[in-house]
From Swiss-Prot:
Subunit and interaction comment: Monomer. Binds 30S ribosomal subunits, but not 50S ribosomal subunits or 70S ribosomes.
Keyword terms: Cytoplasm, Ribosome biogenesis
GO cellular component, one term: cytosol
Protein function: One of several proteins that assist in the late maturation steps of the functional core of the 30S ribosomal subunit. Associates with free 30S ribosomal subunits (but not with 30S subunits that are part of 70S ribosomes or polysomes). Required for efficient processing of 16S rRNA. May interact with the 5'-terminal helix region of 16S rRNA.
GO biological process: maturation of SSU-rRNA
SUPFAM superfamilies documented for this protein: Ribosome-binding factor A, RbfA (SSF89919)
Recorded family membership: Belongs to the RbfA family.
One GO MF term: ribosomal small subunit binding
HAMAP family, per the entry: RbfA (MF_00003)
Species: Cereibacter sphaeroides (strain ATCC 17025 / ATH 2.4.3)
Pfam assignment, any one: RBFA
Classification lineage: Bacteria, Pseudomonadati, Pseudomonadota, Alphaproteobacteria, Rhodobacterales
Protein name: Ribosome-binding factor A
Localisation per UniProt entry: Cytoplasm
InterPro entries: KH_dom-like_a/b, RbfA, RbfA_dom_sf, Ribosome-bd_factorA_CS
Amino acid sequence: MGRMAHRSHTGTGPSQRQLRVGELIRRTLADVLNRGEIHDPDLNRMSITVGEVRCSPDLKVATVHVMPLGGKDVEEAIALLSKHRGELRHHITRQMTLKYAPDLRFRPDETFDRLDETRRLFSDETVQRDIRGSGDGDED
C-alpha cells in the first residue's frame, strides 16, 4: 500500500488539480475580458466566450478554448488574445497563487461544432432505428 498510495496521477484524463486550476483560469479570463481590462479597442469591441481551459499536468501550459459571440472573426480574436498574452497572464497571477504563471495558448472552441455533429448523428435514420431496436428488451 505504501508505494501505491503515493503514486502520481497516471489516468487518461486530467487530474482534479488540473481541472480546478483550469476552471479558475477560465473564470479569471472571462471576467477580465468582460470588464474590458485589456487596453485594446479591437479586443474590447469583441464579446469573447471562454469555453474551457485545459492545463498541462505540470500546470505550466494552459490551452484556452475561446469563441467570439456569433462565431465570427475567430482567427482575429485568437490573434488579439495572443498579442495580449502577457497582460492576461499578469491578471491570472494577481488572482491566483501558482508557482508558475501558465503559458497561455489560444484555440478555437469547437464544443458547439461537436454538439451539432452529435445531434446530426442521433437524428440519422439508421442510428434512430438502432436506438429503438436496443430498447425492446427482446434479448435472451
